[in-house]
UniProtKB/Swiss-Prot annotation:
Belongs to the CLU family. Residues 9-53, 989-1010 have a biased composition (Low complexity). The gene is clu. CDD domains: CLU-central (cd15466). Pfam families: CLU, CLU_N, eIF3_p135, GSKIP_dom, TPR_10, TPR_12. It comes from the Eukaryota. This is Protein clueless. Residues 424-666 form the Clu domain. HAMAP family: CLU. One of its GO terms (biological process) is asymmetric neuroblast division. Residues 66-75, 969-984 have a biased composition (Basic residues). One of its GO terms (cellular component) is cytosol. mRNA-binding protein involved in proper cytoplasmic distribution of mitochondria. It comes from Drosophila yakuba (Fruit fly).
Length: 1451
């Protein structure tokens, strides 16, 4: 069940269906309430102590969660919509076992479902979990730490922590940070670094741990010097811009000018609220410089001129015997030069000079254990600067100092000063990964580490946490190593293992990682599309590795895999199977085929393991004929190879065909697509034959069929029931047991009454399909009723019902709901063993099923995707969020052309159309750019890239800096660096060649000069290639031949295109303002291309228990149990901290949810503290201009305002608006929301004219995207009326308020509170307008102003009323609603569903109850602190989500 429940939740979160989670978390929730609730509460306290350790201080980062623990039960507040969840791992990872329980062929299906993933569903170990959680909460040890020369430090630690983490804590604190070589002693016994604190017998509350300085070794001395260097350049953002050491940027502190929590409330009249020019409505191209504010002052003071290893290294023999370890050379700010010796006791100045070696100590000698102490002693300016750096470092938020899990690259960078740095130089040329790699054995055995961590025990919660933490740590290190290695390979810094072969056939091993290039080396992919197939194969292989890792079958192993795109080349990095290099592949493979099915092998152990995995992945076991015409059984695609390593482990590799092929992009002889698809232009012949369907699609398809199956069965059962009723009157009873047996057969189970389980499963499924959930639920009730009535039916009739339903939905089995796919069904050259017609093994049936799944994608999923975005509830902001949304619906990006065609006919989806067109242009350009880069010498990289950017983004002169003759001259003797230059190129090569035919299958043996010579590319030729690529790859006519026409026709911003393209291909440009309209000189010069960085694809490991806690917490929130929800989500955050450390995308999702809950529970200060951490985390982990970061900024601005930081709230909104416009332009529904917020706050500050500009823009956008009959439009009219009335323009105000009133009256009725408020507003405005008119008339008649006329008094709104309005705009509406009302709503809904009432009747019923609850003030049984969030359907939340009316509406 674990995976299954997770899958449901993941489904709900991915599709943004706020209602789905409740039902699908049922199992978990019941377990938690029954057995585990008492244990869940203490979890936040452990999170506290954890964060103490992670963050190095117990204040900024851990306050909120800690405070919550003691909070009285403030009784529940509003449900947070589920879309927040996306706690999936960022790869749209739905779990693999979604339907395993209900439609497995084997009787023991359920046992198998649970086996592979003991990973953490509470029901998997209901008995053991109590002990686990008790163990988890054994926390809160307070110890004193005594360091030499520093005050005793008192810290609270978690018993789960390792001693090593106290080391880390001390190295992070200001007073002890300069120590690295020390041990920790308790009662004179040295503590083991890798021991858990709870394992230390004599450690108790109040114990004192002593820090004891240890003698240095060569390694420790090097570590110390590196640490000193890191401390000195801690404030320097250069590493973050260069993409080194997992450093990244955050600008929240710069924007808020310090910690928000330390700020005093601001008086409205003291706020500077003028928006910068670039955030006011109407900006055409936003500037680039504000993206990185305060760049000039980012770097701290300089403490030393030079700190480097000395040229006198290493110490000669005699000096080694005196204990010398290494020599350093230092130039201080006072221009003094020193040579320093490191010995086992510490550091001292020696008497060497640049010319003479004299290692004796200087006179007077000063030996310091810490290099910082020695430098402070010899240089006063060092001492001052170091103190300043330390102060600034410790003032920064803890999250600003921790390394990110993976490197985040910046696409724009200022000019960086290049300083002398010996350690950086050493890192660049050493083959190791830096000092942390100096472990026994020197190079790491990545494969052994990756597989051993997966083999760790996982029975109990602490074991699973340890296992997941180890997997995550090793995976992170592997990704870092693989990325470095791939760059070294392309830069020509690694020797090939087959140096004699053609450069593009070369393979490499570096640091125990195997690297191969994305070319078709031995015509392996010749039949499948050559280089184009070879280029995409690693990506499909990575998808396969991901899903097999998610299933996690014990005994089945995959390789560590990372795919890196760098400088136009695709490099695959894999861990090495032990023994694989010692034998030929033919001897190694014991399962699968190495020649696409000509020879096929099978192996009983592999069949057993893959059969288990296949149940989750919906892979159908099938038989194929080998070269001797013998049938061979397979449980995977033919290409999937099984190799037993020298370590005895069963490895699978080449998983590129894990999922069935996409017949819409294959031209096949024996496939006839439906008329609708043919009319839409399918099949489109793709340039490779590896296209396959996504896992999300298969899950949605099976879910859809299951709903149909239940419906059809229900109809037949009702007919049977009617027949039985008539028979009953004749009095022919049948034994009840027989009927129950028959009914249970619906689920394909034997003699077990599974109908309840089946109905629950169906409820879960039905709820996660938004459009059909209500009818499906009605059907479930019908089938329940029918089954109970049919208890008297006989087995034969029930079996007949199931048989008919199976036939109707196209099940593989006649008498059972069974949907699995044969991935080889259309593979060329494979001979299948055809089974009997109508059985699972019938090839015709398998083909039809794959065809139907592909048809389902086009006819159901694409319309569902568009329908979901019609509400603009969580609109994509850039190409990445659009791609994620498409993937969550199971739609591949190759369907983007079809999606654009549909969006182009819908004016209300204009913004999405523009984002999609931009993404398509960027992807088409990427294909061309990769080939272009492969044909460029390293000497000309910056000139070639700037030339390409000029051709893409400008119409001005694009004279390349290198003449074409010179380029040819260089090309003749191109050096090693570019030896991978392909004669065929990578993906996207075919469209470059003038000879290439329409379907991209040109021979590609010779490059035309237009391709081989980058200097000949012009804006016109590049855009022609982009148009051609759009047509060939996406079957879409791009109607523009230059950037100008793209801008005018599609509304694309050049700066947005520059950002998207740089991020997609890994270019870093100089941070400056670019004049794209320049007619006299090229926009981009050589110096504007600062760097190229790798684009890395890998599988991020998951934290299963945290995920379960999170989804259970969401279920609680949806039921209105906010306190319990808060505690569960705090628990999830605590577990995430345990697995991932302090910084991770998923931690950010938890923080955002906790902040929202705190706000709804009435604790705005708590919300502010937590949300501040969420913003910093998103900036650092996702990127400064990532869509999530914009979302976090808008949330933070609301909580800032609620805390009285009015000016700060505006600054945060200005930042969010700037980033929005930079990414996608002003024409976007989310900009309307931000503008409404800005307008309201400006209005509160009395800046009416500015306020009016923003609200007018918001109204224009709301009218465009929501139509005139929508809540956001009514609110915009009302806000506009408020602002105009304050300006004295009562006539306009009156007209606008009338619009609001007419909307409320027609949509909500005359007696609704909002309608009455609007009517009152109209009355006051009319009164003021009449009064003003009377005054004007008096003035006109008398010709002069009279002094006795009373002035018109305009009251500015109170801050409280502004906050209420902000909550309304952002979809947070606080309503008092009692438990009695909830019961009423629930019974009302059930009644309507039974009667099969239309949806709008149900909504009316809910609205009337909620309205009644509101009008009665506090209803019976109402707790004054009972707060419910009710967001009208269509009202937008800040984060662009839709909230359900109440818990009841989600049932």
């Amino acid at each position: 069940m674990a995976l299954e429940t997770e899958a449901k939740n993941s489904n709900a979160t991915a599709t943004g269906d706020a209602t789905a989670t409740k039902a699908s978390s049922k199992a978990k929730e019941n377990n938690n309430t029954a057995g585990g609730k008492k244990n869940l509460n203490p979890i936040p306290s452990q999170q506290n102590s954890n964060q103490n350790l992670v963050n190095g201080n117990g204040t900024a980062a851990d306050g909120p969660a800690g405070k919550k623990k003691g909070k009285k039960n403030r009784n529940k507040s509003p449900p947070e919509p589920t879309t927040e969840a996306v706690l999936s791992n960022g790869h749209a990872e739905k779990s693999t076992a979604e339907y395993a329980a209900e439609d497995n062929a084997d009787a023991d299906a359920n046992a198998n479902v649970e086996k592979p993933e003991d990973g953490g569903a509470p029901d998997a170990e209901a008995d053991g979990e109590d002990i686990d959680l008790d163990a988890l909460q054994d926390v809160g040890i307070t110890v004193n730490i005594s360091s030499p020369g520093a005050d005793v430090l008192c810290v609270q630690l978690s018993s789960m922590e390792l001693v090593q983490e106290i080391h880390q804590l001390l190295m992070d604190r200001e007073e002890t940070c300069h120590r690295t070589c020390f041990s920790l002693q308790l009662d004179n016994a040295t503590l083991d670094n890798f021991a858990e604190l709870k394992a230390i017998s004599n450690l108790e509350q109040g114990s004192t741990i002593k820090v004891v300085e240890e003698p240095y070794t060569m390694r420790e001395a090097r570590i110390h010097v590196r640490h000193v260097r890191d401390l000195l350049k801690n404030l320097d953002p250069a590493d973050a811009y260069n993409g080194i050491d997992c450093t990244s940027l955050t600008y929240l502190n710069t924007i808020t000018q310090g910690d928000l929590l330390d700020k005093k409330k601001t008086r409205p009249d003291s706020v500077d609220c003028t928006p910068p020019e670039y955030v006011t409505p109407g900006v055409s191209e936003p500037p680039l410089l504000p993206l990185h504010p305060n760049v000039k002052n980012a770097k701290g003071p300089q403490a030393l001129k030079v700190l480097t290893t000395s040229a006198w290294n290493p110490p000669p023999g005699p000096r080694k015997l005196h204990g010398d370890l290494m020599y350093l050379y230092v130039v201080t700010m006072e221009e003094k030069r020193f040579h320093i010796s490191a010995c086992s006791k510490g550091f001292y100045i020696n008497q060497s000079t640049d010319d003479t070696f004299n290692p004796k100590p200087d006179n007077p000698s000063h030996l310091s254990h810490s290099l910082i102490d020695l430098l402070s002693h010899i240089s006063p300016s060092f001492r001052r600067a170091f103190q300043t750096i330390q102060k600034r470092r410790t003032m920064r938020h803890a999250f600003e100092r921790v390394a990110t899990p993976y490197q985040v690259y910046q696409w724009a960078s200022p000019t960086l000063e290049h300083t002398v740095d010996a350690i950086r130089a050493e890192d660049a040329f050493s083959s190791k990964l830096g000092y942390e790699e100096h472990i026994p054995g020197q190079t790491r055995d990545w494969n052994e580490e990756l597989q051993t961590t997966r083999e760790l025990p996982r029975k109990t919660l602490p074991e699973r946490l340890l296992r997941e933490r180890a997997i995550f740590k090793v995976h992170g290190d592997f990704v870092t190593a693989a990325t470095r290695g791939a760059m070294a390979v392309i830069d020509g810094n690694v020797l090939a293992i087959n140096p004699g072969e053609d450069p593009k056939m070369q393979m490499f091993i570096w640091n125990n990682i195997f690297f191969s290039l994305g070319f078709d080396v031995r015509d392996h992919y010749k039949e499948l599309g050559g280089d184009a197939a070879a280029f995409v194969a690693p990506r499909y292989d990575l998808h396969g590795v991901r899903v097999y890792n998610a299933v996690d079958v014990e005994g089945l192993y995959t390789l560590g895999t990372v795919v890196i795109d760098y400088r136009g080349y695709r490099v695959t990095a894999q861990s090495i199977i032990p023994g694989i290099l010692e034998r030929e592949q033919e001897q190694s493979v014991v399962y699968g085929s190495i020649d696409f099915g000509k020879t096929v092998l099978s192996h009983p152990k592999y069949l057993e393991l893959l059969r288990q995995a296949g149940k989750h992945l919906k892979i159908l076991p099938h038989a194929v004929l080998n070269e001797r015409d013998e049938p061979v059984e397979l449980c995977s695609s033919v290409e999937c190879k099984g190799i037993i390593g020298n370590d005895g482990r069963h490895y699978i590799l080449d998983l590129l065909r894990t999922f069935p092929p996409d017949v819409n992009f294959l031209k096949l002889q024996d496939v006839q697509l439906s008329k609708e698809l043919v009319d839409m232009g399918f099949p489109i012949e793709h340039r490779h034959k590896l296209c396959c369907l996504r896992q999300e699609l298969l899950e949605a398809f099976i879910e859809d069929r299951h709903v149909s199956f239940i419906r059809i069965a229900a109809v037949h059962l009702q007919q049977l029931n009617a027949k039985k009723q008539s028979e009953k009157t004749e009095g022919k009873p049948v034994p009840a047991l027989e009927g129950a047996d028959a009914a249970s057969k619906v689920n394909g189970a034997d003699k077990t009454d599974v109908k309840e389980e089946k109905n629950e499963e169906n409820e879960e499924k039905a709820q996660s399909t938004t459009g059909e959930s209500k009818t499906a639920e009605a059907m479930v009730n019908a089938i329940r009723e029918a089954q109970s009535n049919v208890a008297t039916s006989n087995e034969v009739q029930a079996a007949e019902v199931v048989k008919r339903a199976c036939a109707a939905v196209g099940s593989l089995k006649e008498k059972e709901f069974d949907f699995r796919f044969n991935p080889d069904v259309f593979s060329p050259g494979i001979r299948h063993v055809d089974g009997e017609e109508g059985t699972c093994s019938s090839l015709a049936k398998q083909k039809v099923l794959v065809q139907e799944a592909a048809e389902f994608l086009v006819l159901k999923q694409i319309p569902a995707f568009i329908k979901e975005h019609m509400t603009h509830s969580s609109p994509p902001i850039d190409g990445q969020s659009l791609t994620e949304s498409l993937h969550s619906h199971g739609i591949n990006v190759r369907y983007l052309g079809k999606v654009i065609k549909i969006l182009g006919q819908m004016p209300r989806m204009d913004y999405l159309h523009r984002i999609a067109v931009l993404e398509l242009i960027v992807r088409a350009t990427k294909h061309i750019y990769y080939t272009y880069m492969q044909n460029t010498e390293p000497l000309h990289l910056s000139a070639a890239i700037s030339h390409f950017l000029n051709c893409l983004l400008t119409n001005g002169p694009v004279n390349p800096a290198v003449s074409s003759e010179e380029a040819h001259k260089k090309r003749g003797n191109g050096g090693k660096h570019n030896k991978h230059k392909s004669s065929k190129g990578g993906k996207g090569q075919q469209q470059q060649q003038t000879t290439g035919n329409q379907n991209g299958s040109s021979s590609g043996t010779s490059n035309g000069s237009s391709v081989s010579d980058w200097t000949l590319v012009t804006p016109r030729s590049l855009w022609q290639q982009i148009r051609k690529e759009a047509k060939v790859y996406w079957d879409w006519e791009l109607d523009c031949d230059s950037i100008e026409t793209a801008v005018s026709k599609y509304g694309i911003l050049r700066i947005s295109l520059l950002r998207a393209f740089c991020l997609k291909v890994g270019i870093q440009v100089l941070l400056r303002e670019y004049n794209f309209e320049s007619k006299h000189k090229p926009t981009f010069g050589d110096d504007d291309v600062v760097n190229v960085f790798p684009v890395v694809k890998h599988i991020s490991p998951r934290a299963t228990d945290a995920y379960n806690f999170y989804t259970t917490g969401q279920a609680k929130i949806q039921q209105g149990m906010f306190k319990e929800g808060y505690e569960l989500i705090s628990g999830a955050l605590n577990l995430l901290n345990n697995v991932f450390g302090a910084l991770h995308q998923e931690n950010g999702s938890c923080l955002r949810m906790l902040a929202r809950l705190s706000y709804l529970l009435g604790d705005a200060q708590d919300a502010l503290a937590i949300q501040q951490r969420a913003v910093i985390m998103s900036e650092r982990v996702n990127g400064m201009d990532h869509p999530s970061t914009i979302l976090e900024y808008t949330h933070l601005s609301l909580y800032s305002f609620a805390n009285g930081h009015v000016g700060m709230s505006l600054k945060l909104l200005y930042r969010a608006r700037y980033l929005m416009v930079l990414i996608c332009g002003e024409d976007h529904p989310e900009v309307a929301l931000i503008d409404s917020n800005i307008s309201l706050i400006l209005h509160a500050l009395g800046e009416y004219e500015l306020s009016l500009r923003f609200i007018e823009h918001a109204l224009k956008l709301n009218l465009k995207y929501f139509g005139d009959k929508a809540m956001p439009v009514a609110l915009s009219y009302h806000l506009m009326a408020r602002t105009q009335s304050c300006m004295g323009d009562f006539r306009s105000a009156l007209n606008n308020e009338k619009e609001t009133y007419s909307f409320y009256k027609s949509q909500l009725g005359e007696n609704h509170e909002k309608t009455r408020d609007s009517a009152e507003c109209l009355r006051l405005l009319t009164q003021q307008a009449v009064l003003l008119q009377r005054k004007m008339n008096d003035i006109y008649s008398s010709g002069k102003l009279t002094s006795d006329l009373p002035p018109i008094h305009i009251t500015p709104p109170s801050m409280g009323s502004v906050l209420d309005m902000l909550n309304t705009i952002n979809g947070i509406l606080f309503v008092k609603i009692s438990r009695k009302d909830i019961v009423k709503v629930r019974s009302e809904i059930e009644k309507h569903f039974k009667a099969d009432s239309p949806e709008n009747e149900v909504n009316d019923a809910i609205n009337s109850i909620v309205a009644a609850a509101n009008n009665n003030g506090e209803a019976e049984d109402a707790d004054p602190k009972d707060v419910k969030e009710q967001a009208q359907a269509g009202t937008q939340l800040t984060n662009g989500e839709k909230a359900a009316a109440t818990e009841a509406t989600s049932s």
